[in-house]
């Protein structure tokens, strides 16, 4: 079975922007309380679009409460892998998987898995901000209401708590009833993070969350990731080598659907085990 043009487009990552290849190595990071246990475990996990194998037999442990960056050239399968973790790829008719992918020991693709509950526990923020055409308040309250929360006082508390976690409360607290589409791009992206946090996920998936933002807004998102680190397991797809080195504890490097290397970020950027990893992070190919 061959992929349609639309499915091929969906399976490929957004083309990388031209960027410097100077690598910034972060200083030693503080320890994470309660972290270190595998939160997501992939074993011989593959993803297909028809007959096309987009992700090939990945074996990896994603550790709880740490930040894991996923890097690699366009079309390498990094976003496809990320989307598989909360089953966003189910929306593509020809997509199917082999092997296993587990979350807290449970098979993500098991027959008894509740996809709605799974996506509550594993939230996702996309490349482009996608606020609903509703008020700021209703954007954040949408998820809790969907899951049965109707008490006005409780909803107000959740909205404030989520906006504070997303470092947005001080900027919007006096205009919660205004349309969220009136926010700046960076504010909209933080709103999307707050909307995800409102349903209290365990894992936060970020698919190139700053690629459409200016440097100032990008810095705020990176600061936010550091604030959330230790409270959530975070996975971020990025084309930006410096961003990966700044925000992550661990890095996964994909090439043509294969997980080439998965290591601590400092180790991967300073002493990669695989020659292909070294060639990529030093800009010999992109």
UniProtKB/Swiss-Prot annotation:
One of its GO terms (molecular function) is ATP binding. GO terms for biological process: phosphate ion transmembrane transport. Its EC number is 7.3.2.1. Part of the ABC transporter complex PstSACB involved in phosphate import. Responsible for energy coupling to the transport system. The complex is composed of two ATP-binding proteins (PstB), two transmembrane proteins (PstC and PstA) and a solute-binding protein (PstS). Gene3D superfamilies: P-loop containing nucleotide triphosphate hydrolases. This is Phosphate import ATP-binding protein PstB. It catalyses: phosphate(out) + ATP + H2O = ADP + 2 phosphate(in) + H(+). It is a peripheral membrane protein. It is an enzyme of class 7 (translocase). GO terms for cellular component: plasma membrane. Residues 40-281 form the ABC transporter domain. SMART domains: AAA (SM00382). Keywords: ATP-binding, Cell inner membrane, Cell membrane, Membrane, Nucleotide-binding, Phosphate transport, Translocase, Transport.
């Amino acid at each position: 079975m061959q992929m349609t043009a639309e499915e091929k487009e969906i399976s490929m990552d957004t083309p990388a922007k031209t960027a410097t290849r100077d690598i910034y190595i972060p200083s030693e990071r503080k320890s994470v309380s309660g972290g270190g246990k595998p939160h997501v475990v992939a074993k011989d996990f593959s993803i297909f679009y028809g007959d096309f194998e987009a992700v090939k037999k990945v074996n990896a442990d994603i550790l709880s409460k740490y930040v894991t960056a996923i890097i690699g050239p366009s079309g390498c399968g990094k976003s496809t892998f990320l989307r598989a973790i909360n089953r966003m790829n189910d929306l593509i008719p020809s997509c199917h998987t082999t092997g296993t992918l587990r979350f807290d020991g449970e098979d993500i693709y098991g027959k008894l898995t509740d996809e709605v509950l799974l996506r509550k526990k594993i939230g996702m923020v996309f490349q482009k901000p996608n606020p609903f055409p509703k008020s700021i308040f209703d954007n954040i309250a949408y998820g809790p209401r969907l899951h049965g929360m109707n008490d006005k006082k409780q909803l107000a508390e959740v909205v404030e708590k989520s906006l504070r976690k997303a470092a947005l409360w001080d900027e919007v607290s006096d205009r919660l009833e205004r349309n969220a589409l009136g926010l700046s791009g960076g504010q909209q992206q933080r709103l999307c993070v707050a909307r995800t946090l409102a349903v209290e996920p365990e894992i936060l998936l970020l698919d190139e969350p700053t690629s459409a933002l200016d440097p100032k807004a990008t810095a705020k998102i990176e600061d936010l990731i550091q604030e959330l680190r230790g409270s959530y397991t975070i996975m971020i797809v990025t084309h930006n080598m410096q961003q990966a080195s700044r925000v992550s504890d661990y890095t996964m490097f994909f090439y043509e659907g294969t997980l080439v290397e998965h290591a601590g970020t400092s180790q991967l950027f300073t002493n990669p085990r695989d020659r292909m990893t070294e060639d990529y992070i030093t800009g010999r190919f992109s």
